[in-house]
């Protein structure tokens, strides 16, 4: 009989709008502190939305300042490098020459990284008739940075991380919009179970807080326009919600073989127990109102982890604060959990951090792991007038203390991609066939 490998989470690194590390981020989420404010990184005064959840006071730490890869790194790439460095330090692990081929990296990332200034430079070579004139663009004296082309590749973050940390095993870059970080972690779990590697550095990063990203979401009507009260603008499941707050950041986890982690005396935050992955195939911008896609993802994650719905004590919902998403996700939760939806704790930490797009699933997975560790379900901030169609047991007012045996993290992306990840308390005994036993 085949014994399935158990996977331990032993390191966490976070760079978010509410903290530059995991401890600060977690403390602020539990306190319900908002990271939203008026956008400072560029002039957003001409947009319908002028607020965002920016990473504040960010600087590359001394340990990374001499890194060669910084030459190629965008702001979002730097978030990733810092969060990954934190996760490895937290785990007390680092790829070495002898083990580098047994390390893998799975990264969730967003759109091509093209600086707004670079777009302006290209636009300068459009003639008055709208026809593009390449001669000037290709001239040796053109001021554009040739490194920008390398930096703009969607897998550039993966390349920078693996180069900097010396990872030579399995590597993949996932691009499924808001589900990217979650699906990158799910991929890492599968790779670990198959024995391709012994360690994985997995997570996601993104920053769409620029004129291009803000204009796109404004045109879609997806963002809150509560510019006078940014700290209250993101209010998932509230009857008055009117859109999400755009954020930025990165989150990374270190995964390793459960038995090896215990043998070396590592602190194990949680077992990475299950992964669910589905497609809604409905619209590019939202899920079907029935919640069919998220239902499949949650059912898959529970089955993969060997968990019954009643064994789950906390769900970190995708909860974007948009009218359609919040209702359909609650319908999906009710369909999967049944009467247990009245008991398990549910919250969306986007109420504090905003929507980190490709990084969201990875950061929120880390939130689930910390919730399991501390026995705390973080508050769903700004929830004052509950939408009656969001009839699940939401964490209101303040964070809730409870023993969390298992937790789910939902991420639902543009294009219909859905991710659900299941995490189990390290003291919980898994179901036969799902905890390393025969199946």
Per-region residue spans from a language model:
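Active-site pocket-shaping loop/turn-to-helix segments
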Residues: 14-23, 65-85, 111, 145-151, ...
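Glycine-/small-residue-rich "gating" segment that lines the acyl/pantetheine channel
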Residues: 126-145, 186, 190, 194, ...
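Conserved beta-ketoacyl condensing-enzyme motif
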Residues: 9, 22, 27-173, 205-214, ...
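Phosphate/pyrophosphate-binding loops at sites that engage ATP/ADP/AMP, CoA/4′-phosphopantetheine
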Residues: 87-99, 261-265, 297-314, 336-340
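Condensing-enzyme catalytic core mediating Claisen C-C bond formation in acyl metabolism
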Residues: 6-10, 33, 37-38, 228-305, ...
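ACP-dependent fatty acid/polyketide chain-elongation machinery
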Residues: 1-69, 91, 109, 259-271, ...
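Active-site-proximal alpha-helical scaffold in enzymes
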Residues: 80-93, 154-158, 162-165, 171-206, ...
